[in-house]
Regions:
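Charged/polar positions within long, soluble alpha-helices
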Residues: 130-141, 175, 182, 186-193
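Post-HExxH zinc-binding segment in Zn-dependent metallohydrolases
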Residues: 159-173, 177
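Acidic, Ser/Thr-rich low-complexity intrinsically disordered segments
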Residues: 216-262
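Amphipathic alpha-helical interface elements
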Residues: 5-107, 119-120, 179-218, 222, ...
């Protein structure tokens, strides 16, 4: 095997064209940063992907290994609240009487399947990541339902009953990831362009309100780690789980509210994670709990 080539952008000095589909642009820091920076109709910006840091993998490795590294990277990209934000941006808007309270125009009939495929792909990645990585832990409880879903998905991708075995079959699965990631990028670009150039003020307002709701869900999931990080930065004990849980229980709503206010009042792009850290510092300091 030739010297390793790392993802997620093709090297400038060229590469084997057979590896074209091994480079997933959606997994690169540059692409994620670009997407996060494109919505400027509000000063604080809209982060579609939060806390993502690219983890390169060897592109010219064995196809099976490349595939699972892609799955792992995509799971990291969409975990926490990013899947909820993607669900917001990739929703199908139907003429069902509720389209007036949606942040996007009615979805064209010929585009509906693309959006549905994108959301299905996100669920597939979650299932594959859990089945392949989580179920390998000795203390994990095997999720039989997800296992069956993954088996059926592989069968559908390959049109067989045994799943991927050969290198060619794993390459076919990589192509499946590549095409779906390309589809998601195209749909996000379309929705971002609409919000920037065509959306009404009411649609933009609805988008922001739903975005804040997604952020609140995100904060509920990471509040323990937020407070733990503040204690670490203040050089206080951050290994006392009982204390941290007590601080979370007493302060999580106040911290989330403060973080949202900080985001809304920001005169520049505001990273929701950094806003939560700042809010936790302010609230805990005001209450003299740190």
């Amino acid at each position: 095997m030739c010297s390793p080539i790392y993802s997620n952008n093709p090297p400038e000095n060229g590469y084997d064209s057979k590896l074209e589909k091994h480079f997933i642009s959606l997994l690169s820091d540059a692409t994620v940063s670009d997407i996060n920076a494109k919505l400027t109709f509000v000063k604080h910006g809209i982060y579609l992907f939060i806390q993502y840091k690219e983890m390169g993998y060897v592109v010219n490795s064995f196809p099976e290994e490349v595939f699972w590294n892609m799955v792992n990277g995509l799971y990291r990209l969409i975990h926490d609240c990013s899947d909820k934000i993607l669900e917001l941006f990739l929703q199908v808007v139907k003429k069902d009487g509720f389209q007036a309270i949606k942040p996007f125009k009615q979805t064209d009939a010929h585009k509906v399947q693309q959006f549905e495929d994108a959301m299905e792909f996100i669920k597939d990645i979650e299932n594959m990541r859990i089945v392949h990585f989580h179920n390998m832990k000795t203390d994990s409880i095997t999720d039989k339902d997800k296992e069956r879903k993954v088996e059926k998905k592989f069968q559908k991708i390959l049109n067989n009953t045994i799943g991927p075995k050969s290198e060619a079959e794993w390459e076919h699965c990589i192509t499946w990831i590549y095409k779906n990631c390309k589809n998601i990028q195209e749909l996000l670009e379309e929705r971002i362009k609409f919000l920037q150039t065509e959306a009404t003020e009411e649609q933009r307002k609805l988008l922001c309100e739903k975005y804040y709701s997604c952020i609140r869900v995100y904060y509920n999931g990471i509040m323990f780690e937020i407070i733990k990080e503040i204690l670490r930065k203040k050089r206080e004990s951050y290994k006392d789980c009982t204390r941290i849980l007590a601080l979370v229980k007493e302060n999580e709503e106040d911290i989330a509210n403060k973080a949202i206010v900080l985001i809304q009042n920001a005169d520049r792009r505001a990273d929701p994670y950094l806003a939560a850290l700042q809010a936790a510092d302010i609230i805990l300091t005001q209450k003299k709990q740190i």
